[in-house]
Each structure stands twice: as C-alpha cells, then as structure tokens.
Amino acid sequence: MGKIIGIDLGTTNSCVSIMDGGKARVIENSEGDRTTPSIVAYTKDGEVLVGASAKRQAVTNPKNTFYAVKRLIGRKFTDGEVQKDISHVPYGILAHDNGDAWVQTSDAKRMAPQEISARVLEKMKKTAEDFLGEKVTEAVITVPAYFNDSQRQATKDAGRIAGLDVKRIINEPTAAALAYGLDKNGGDRKIAVYDLGGGTFDVSIIEIAEVDGEKQFEVLATNGDTFLGGEDFDNRVIEYLVDEFNKDQGIDLRKDPLALQRLKDAAERAKIELSSSQQTEVNLPYVTADASGPKHLNIKLTRAKLEALVEDLVKKSIEPCRTALNDAGLRASDINEVILVGGQTRMPKVQQAVADFFGKEPRKDVNPDEAVAVGAAIQGGVLAGDVKDVLLLDVTPLSLGIETMGGVFTKIIEKNTTIPTKASQTFSTAEDNQSAVTVHVLQGEREQARFNKSLAKFDLSGIEPAPRGMPQVEVSFDIDANGILHVSAKDKKTNKEQKVEIKAGSGLSDEEIQRMVADAEANREEDKKFQELVQARNQADGLIHATRTAITEHGSKVGGDVIGKVEAALSDLETAMKGDDKAQIEARTKTLEEAGQSLYAAAAAAEQGGNADAASGNAQASKAADDVVDAEFTEVKDDKK
C-alpha cells in the first residue's frame, strides 16, 4: 500500500505532508518552499503555471491568473459573498448552466473552481511523488470546518480530477489539533483552535483525552465564516489605496485589471510588513496613465490605520468563538490552550483580540502555515495503520433536515453532532390520497426552509392512496466520516425506498468530472512531453556551447572538411531547436555529437602528427651534431685584419 499524503488546500497557500519514520514531515516543492501559492495561470502559448511561477507573472497576465478560488468552490453565482468578490478580482466570474460560480479566461474559456483547485492538488501530488520516488494515489485533504456539504463534495471532486482517491476530508482546526496534541502529554485538556486563513475562518473547541491508552481528539463544537480571511483584510487595504489615489488624481483604479493586480500584491506586502513595523510605504510607479501622462502611487500606511480599516473584520471573528463556546457548554476560562492557525493570525491585532477573548495568550509554538497539513498527514497515517492509538471524533458543522408543511425547516441531525452518524424521523402526507412526496434536503440553522442551503430534492412515489396523515414515510440521514450526506426515504407500508447520495443541486455531474479527469490526464501527458522537450533542448544547448568551444580551441589543427561537417551539424541543430519536434532535436543532437567526435579525433591525430615531426627534427639535428668535427680556432683581433 502506498503512502496516504496529507494536503492543506488553502485559499492563499497550500502545503503537503507525509508520515516519515513515525513523524509528520512537510515536503518542500520544486522551488524549495514548504508552502505553495494556490495560484494557477494560463499563458498565451497554452502553458499552465502553478504556484510561485504563476504568482510571478500575475501582474502581466491578470485576467488569466486565478487565485482565492477556494472562496468560490461549491457556491452559487448569486451568493452574496461571490458577488462581493467579483469587484475585487481581475479575472472573470460568471454563472454556469446550473447556477454555480465558475471562472473565465480572457479568451472566454470557462472553468469550474474544482478544475483550478485540481491543478494545485496536482502540484502537491507531484511534490510528494518527487520526494518519495513513487506514485501517490491517496490523500487526506483538509477543508474549513464550516464548509457545507456542497463545498465538501466539490473538494472531493477536485481531488478526483487531480488523480487522487480522497480517503478522508478532515476539518482544518481538527487537523491542527492533531498536529499540536499528538506528542503532547500532561493529561486531559480542552483547546480552542482559532483558524484565520486566506479566505475562511473557523474556530473549534476540542477535548484531548487519554482513554484506555488511546489518545482521543473529540470536537465539542465548531463555528466559523467561510467568507472571512486574509483576502478580506487585503481588500480593505486595496479599497483605501484606491480611494486615496482617486482623491488625489481623480482616477478610479478599480477599472484597470493590471493596476488592480499590482495593488493586490502591494496591499498584501504592506499588511505583512505592518505585523513587524509601525509604518510602511506603498510605492507603485507608473500605476496608470491619462492624457496628462503617467501616474505614480505613493501612500504611507501606518499600523494604526490598518487596524482601523480591519477592526470590524477582527470583531467578526470573535462572535463565532463565543457561539462555539456556548455550544460546547464551556466558558473561556475552561480552555487550557489556544492555538492559532492560518497566516492572518500573525497580525498583532488578531493575536490581541484572541488573547482578550479567551483570557490567555495564544501559543506561539505551532507553525500557522504548516500545522493543518501535518494534521492531515497524521490522519493519513491513522487510516493507513501507521499511527496507532489515536481516535478522532469530528462533528457536522451545520444542522441537516428537510422542508415540511408551511415552509418549515425540520432538523433531523443537529449541528455539532459527532460523525459518522445516522438519524431517522417519520413524516406523513399533507393531502388526501397523495401518491408521492418530494423530499427537500437542507442544511443550516434558520427556522424558515428558504433561508437555508438547499442540498437536493428527490421524490418518493408509489405511496398507496390514504387520507392525509395516515401514510408513514421514514426519512433517514446518514453522514459519513467525510461529513458527506446520504439520504433515503421509505414508505413503511409498502417498503418502497428511494436513496440518494447528496451531490447538491450545484456541483459537477459525473460526466463533467469524467471530462475534467480526462483533461487533467491529457494535460499531465502534455506536461510530461513539455518537460521532455525542455530536457532535449537543454542537452542540445549544452552540446552547441561545448562544440563551439572545441572549434575555437582545435579548429586551426584540422582540415576544412571536418570543420565544414561540424558547422553544418551545428546549423541543423540550431534550426531544429526553433521548433517543437523533440525527435528531430534529439536526432540532430546525435549527429552533432558524432561530428564533434570526428573533430576531437582529427585534432588528436594532428597533435600526434605534430609530435612525430618534432621528434624527427630532433633526430636530424642530433645526427648533424654528430657529424661536426671539433677544431681549434685562433681569435683574430680587429686591428690585424
């Protein structure tokens, strides 16, 4: 059995980890970094860039560079959060046929957020494979604890498109608790995991206990906001910079995708700098231009100003903490440790707000960027049997139920119920002689069904005619360990049953997933061919350089016909390198190698010939010296001439 890798698929950055020698190990990517930007770019020549390379070219290719798509995954285009994001990103967001939010490139190619996320997952998969030296097919992938069923299913679909069998979907705060608590001793304790990442926020209250020699991680309650994170903090800075520039220059930079991308990068940098300094300067020369010429942006930003801009966002993260504590039946003073996860928790204002609420300083010994991936790897180790004596008890974050008469939401499974779990409830018909019922499955906390998230609708038909209220229809909900729901409805009299795995009215159809899997496979093959072509070009380039050096050093020693053959082979190879035919490049590389060998052989022969001539000349000189007869001479003075 191969390794089950752990992947933190983040809004801003992603990370991959494996169990290695009983310890979780974060793997560096091909650039040598332990985290990878969750950014995917499509270039004009058809190349797909992922991670740092995609981020580097974002300013020059803003409409085809996709970031923060995790905020769109499993969401409808009409969602208020999606509409809010449209004005903040330079790329296109539009509605797919089923109403889902999809993204669009500058040449009108449409893609599901799952496809973009799959590219990031492929990069994580390749990173692990390069390290292990073997193929990886199984993974544990993390999601925000407050992700609903649609978002979880969409994440699983992204894994499938990337060629991964997703063995488990695990909540991010729970993963962080695993990373923190696995090797900690010291008795039972309750911890709060405050996870403020790039695009989402979660808080989980978790009890770590020793039960019969087994370390048990039980989630007592979870809460959060799937549209609150570092991106929102960045957007506040962007809005401030745009407004200040508009006041000064009378130009609205929101309408310029290139300027917007530069502002995005600058805002993120400024925010990070202000975590360690009191003031920074945002300087963007030539940010735009009008009839009077180029315009430059130069604005000072203080930590105090930044904190004022985001104060309501920080406060917004505290309310779910209060709710989670209440749901767990605890007070802040009952919490033994507070763990911070997610890059945005490096902001001093956030740390202070958390410390004030819980009444204790958060721990600083957990890496906020890596803890979630480490926890995912540990869960992978548990599933593979490599990690023993660990039990993880997670919960469903939102209540699940159906719509009943009068548009009421009737809960069947309450929020914060430990999963996996099953629950059933019996309902009846609303009209006389009703032969079918429609089961409308919902997720949420509102009393009115229409305000909750619709997951699916299906019909149970074949009910025997009877007065209203007489037939008995049993509706059963079954949540698996991934938090994904299966629903069935059964007429108790006839035993007729209808089952459905909730794929949500949104989400990808099996046909769409299969197409995307096929596209990903084709792209993997294309990527492989591209790498092989680059390798062939690099080899050819090295040979050309070496051959030219050889001509310079040895050209004067060999005949013109040898040099002519080498020059011809050089020219042919240089021509081949302008194209994309790998076979031709390799064939002409071989021809040049052979011509080069002839050059070296001729040069060596010429050198040996030169040495032979020198030896012959020395012999003649020696013989002539032997024929000389010694004689005595009398010196003749000039005055005797």
UniProtKB/Swiss-Prot annotation:
Modification Phosphothreonine occurs at: T200
Induction: By stress conditions e.g. heat shock.
Extent of Low complexity compositional bias: 606-623
Keywords on record: ATP-binding, Chaperone, Nucleotide-binding, Phosphoprotein, Stress response
Start and end residues of each stretch annotated as Disordered: 606-627
Recorded GO MF terms: ATP binding; ATP-dependent protein folding chaperone; unfolded protein binding
Gene3D superfamilies: 1.20.1270.10, 3.30.420.40, Actin, Chain A, domain 4, Substrate Binding Domain Of DNAk, Chain A, domain 1
InterPro entries attached to this UniProt entry: ATPase_NBD (IPR043129), Chaperone_DnaK (IPR012725), Heat_shock_70_CS (IPR018181), HSP70_C_sf (IPR029048), HSP70_peptide-bd_sf (IPR029047), Hsp_70_fam (IPR013126)
Keyword flag ATP-binding: yes
Function of the molecule: Acts as a chaperone.
Family: Belongs to the heat shock protein 70 family.
Protein name (Swiss-Prot/TrEMBL): Chaperone protein DnaK
Species annotation: Xanthomonas euvesicatoria pv. vesicatoria (strain 85-10) (Xanthomonas campestris pv. vesicatoria)
